[in-house]
């Protein structure tokens, strides 16, 4: 497996990473044993870069990843904070808005460390921008966690080039994560160029279009009732039929 360096601070990961969200959140129910077998096979193939978040579950995805990496020191896990999580409801219904308040960041990191069973988080992302908290305050808190040894490298997700520049001025950012695939190409407008300029790694999520570009995607109305893709315009029946014709070319 080829390796890639993300940013300028020393983070090196496998060229292919594995996003774990769908194993316990967002895409309907999944079998834990099957998910663990998938992770074990990924490790055999040389993948050492996993992506999770506290909000996936919530919390259960990090616990799943912890089972997969237990006893290993070669796997690099990225996790995220940035949402207010209600004690009420199930799944995505528990996400009640952005929260990157410094105190919340610290609570989230302590929780992630405990659930993942690690002493240090390899890569910590802000999951989404919080309009109520300046990015300088967010990254300042994250940088404090680096100095305290609780986090190694910092990342952001779905921010603009201007925000990325402001963040980089506070502390080196190792990775920027955004959706990027053949049918979601917004990063080509400017964010990829900004990442190159600032020497920040770019980590695409959903590179297979949330499964659609595999060529094996079922009709959206056959997805599980709690599969959030049912709510996305691109998967509505008319749009999906049009998009499928493009994939089939």
Predicted regions and their residues:
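Conserved, mostly hydrophobic/aromatic
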Residues: 6, 18, 35, 42, ...
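Active-site mouth loops of central-metabolism enzymes
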Residues: 21-33, 91-106, 127-132
């Amino acid at each position: 497996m080829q390796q890639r360096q993300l940013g300028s601070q020393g983070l090196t990961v496998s060229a292919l990473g594995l996003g774990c969200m769908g194993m316990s959140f967002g895409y309907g129910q999944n079998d834990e044993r099957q998910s663990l077998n998938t992770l074990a096979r990924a490790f055999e193939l040389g993948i050492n870069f996993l992506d999770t978040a506290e909000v996936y579950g919530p919390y259960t995805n990090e616990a799943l990843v912890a089972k997969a990496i237990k006893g290993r020191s070669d796997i690099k896990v990225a996790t995220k904070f940035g949402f207010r999580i209600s004690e009420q409801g199930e799944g995505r219904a528990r996400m009640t808005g952005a929260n990157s308040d410094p105190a919340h960041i610290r609570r989230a990191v302590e929780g992630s460390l405990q659930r993942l069973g690690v002493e240090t988080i390899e890569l910590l992302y802000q999951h989404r921008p919080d309009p109520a908290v300046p990015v300088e305050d967010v990254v300042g808190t994250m940088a404090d966690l680096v100095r305290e040894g609780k986090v190694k490298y910092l990342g952001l997700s779905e921010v603009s080039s201007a925000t990325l520049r402001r963040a980089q001025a506070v502390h080196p950012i190792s990775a920027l994560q955004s959706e990027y695939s053949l049918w979601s190409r917004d990063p080509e407008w400017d964010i990829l160029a900004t990442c190159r300029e600032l020497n920040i790694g770019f980590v695409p999520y959903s590179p297979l279009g949330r499964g659609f570009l595999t060529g094996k995607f079922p009709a959206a109305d056959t997805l599980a009732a709690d599969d959030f893709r049912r709510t996305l315009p691109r998967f509505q029946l008319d749009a999906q039929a049009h998009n499928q014709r493009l994939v089939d070319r």
